[in-house]
Amino acid sequence: MAGIDNKAAVMGEWFDCSTTNHRKRSKAELGREFSLNYIKNEDSLQTTFQESSRGALRERIAARSGFNAPWLNTEDILQSKSLTISSPGLSPATLLESPVFLSNPLLSPTTGKLSSVPSDKAKAELFDDITTSLAFQTISGSGLDPTNIALEPDDSQDYEERQLGGLGDSMACCAPADDGYNWRKYGQKLVKGSEYPRSYYKCTHPNCEAKKKVERSREGHIIEIIYTGDHIHSKPPPNRRSGIGSSGTGQDMQIDATEYEGFAGTNENIEWTSPVSAELEYGSHSGSMQVQNGTHQFGYGDAAADALYRDENEDDRTSHMSVSLTYDGEVEESESKRRKLEAYATETSGSTRASREPRVVVQTTSDIDILDDGYRWRKYGQKVVKGNPNPRSYYKCTANGCTVTKHVERASDDFKSVLTTYIGKHTHVVPAARNSSHVGAGSSGTLQGSLATQTHNHNVHYPMPHSRSEGLATANSSLFDFQSHLRHPTGFSVYIGQSELSDLSMPGLTIGQEKLTSLQAPDIGDPTGLMLQLAAQPKVEPVSPQQGLDLSASSLICREMLSRLRQI
C-alpha cells in the first residue's frame, strides 16, 4: 500500500487546484509540464514499486517452475536520458511500432531471414532517383530549424543549353552558306534570344520565286537555312556565281555581281574595236564604235568614255545595293532605302535589264539639250551624278510597250559637248509628225533615223545634230537626212542665234504662187543661243506660174518645218 500512497502523493504534485494558475497558463504549457513531470517521477515510482513487489513475484515464479530463479541485479543498468518527447500527442508506443526506426526481431515467415535496417548503399540508390538534389546539414541539439534545409540551384537547364550550344557549333559546319545559286538579301529581322538578326534572301534569277531564311546562333554561326519556293532554273556555272557567304566570322554578306550576256568571269573593263562598222555622218567627220563591257559607245574623245564609266558605276550601285554588313553593328542598309531601290528597279523593268541591253552614247556639240531624233520622249527625272557638275536628265519613250530610255548630260570639261545615252531597242517605227500625216507618208524615209532597224542590222545610225557654228542642219546632216543635190526654195531663210539654215532642202518643194521672204534673224543673238525669234508674218508675193507646183503641198511642208523648229 505504500506504493499506492506514494503514487497518490505524486498525483497531488501533478495537479494544482488553483484556478488562477490554469487561467494564466496555456494548454500547451500545461501539457508540456505534465509530460516532463511524468517522466521525472517515473524512475522513483518504479524503484519503490519494484522493491515492494520483488519478493512476492519471485516466490510465485519459484512455485510455478519448481526452482528458484536467480536474482537479477538491475541497479547497474543505466537508463538513457536522451529520449525526450516534446509533443504531448506522441507516445513511446508509436515509436516502437514504427517499421522505420526499429527492426523486427522475428524471422520472416516467407524467407526465414531477419529483416535488417536499410544500408547506406540502399539509401544512396534511393536518393539517386530524386531529380532535385538536397543539401543536408547537421541538426543542432536545440531542435529542428526549417531554414537548415536548402535547395541547391538547378544546373540542369544550363547544362542543356551548353549541350545545345555545342550542337549548334557542330551544325554550323553542316549548314553551307553557298548552295550554288545567286541570292540577294532583301531584309532582316531581330529574333528573340539571338544577337544576330534573321536574314532573308531571294534568288536573283528573273521570275524565280525561291527564297531562303538564314538563322544564326549566338556565336554568329549559321545553324539553319529554311528554303521556300522552288527554283525554275538550273544552277549557274561556277564562274558566274557571285554569292559570298561567310561562316564563322559573323559577317552576313551577299554580293551580286553584274552579269553580261556573252561574258563570263571578271568585271574588268575590256575594250576593243568592234568588227561591225558604224558610220556616223557628222559633216566631214566619222565616228568609231567601241564595245566596253557589252556596251556600244559612240564618241569623239574622253568625255563619252567618262560618261559611260559613270553610267556603269551608277548602274552597279543601283542594281547591287543589297550588300549588308551585320557584324559588330557595322553599316547596314535601311528598310526604306531598300524599298526605294526595289521600286526603282521595278519601274525600270528590272535592275539587270539596263546592264544587258545595248547602250549607245552619242556625243555632239550644241547649245541646246533637247535634240530631236524623231522619237517622242517624256522626261521623268534629273539628278547630278558623281564626277560631273552638270545635271543629267532622264527620258523614256512614250510609245506603248517600248522600254527604251535615254539620259542627256553635258560633258564635265566642255559645256557645249552634249552626251546622249540610248538604252535599249525601239520595238516600233518612228512616229509620224504631229501636225501632218502627209509628211509621214511621203517623206518618212527622210525624216527618221530608225534606231531599231539599224541596230538590228548592226549598222547603228543615230541622228547627229550639229553645232551652233555649223547650223542645226546641213546638206549632209542626219537630223533631217535631206538630199544634197536639192536646193532650198527661193526666198526661204531661217536664222537661229547667228547661224543661218541655208541648206534646208525639201524634195519637190517649189513654190508656185507665193514666196516666203521675211523670216529674219534677231539683231542681237542670245548669249545662250536658245532663243528663236520670228519676225512678222511671211509676206506673200506673186510669182510666175511656171516656177512651182501646187500651193497646198508647199504650205503643208512649210508648216511642218516651222513646227520642227519650234520644238527645237
From Swiss-Prot:
Localization annotation: Nucleus
Residues reported in the UniProt entry to bind Zn(2+): 203, 208, 231, 233, 397, 402, 426, 428
Region of interest called Disordered, as start-end residue ranges on this chain: 230-252, 337-360
GO biological process: pollen development; pollen germination; response to cold
Keyword DNA repair: no
Keywords for the protein's UniProt record, in alphabetical order: DNA-binding, Metal-binding, Nucleus, Repeat, Transcription, Transcription regulation, Zinc
Top-level taxon of origin: Eukaryota
GO cellular component: nucleus
Main location class: nucleus
InterPro entries: WRKY_dom (IPR003657), WRKY_dom_sf (IPR036576), WRKY_plant (IPR044810)
Chain residues forming the annotated DNA-binding region: 172-236, 366-431
GO molecular function: DNA-binding transcription factor activity; metal ion binding; transcription cis-regulatory region binding
Function description: Transcription factor. Interacts specifically with the W box (5'-(T)TGAC[CT]-3'), a frequently occurring elicitor-responsive cis-acting element.
Sequence similarity: Belongs to the WRKY group I family.
Protein known as: Probable WRKY transcription factor 34
Organism: Arabidopsis thaliana (Mouse-ear cress)
Lineage, opening ranks: Eukaryota, Viridiplantae, Streptophyta, Embryophyta, Tracheophyta
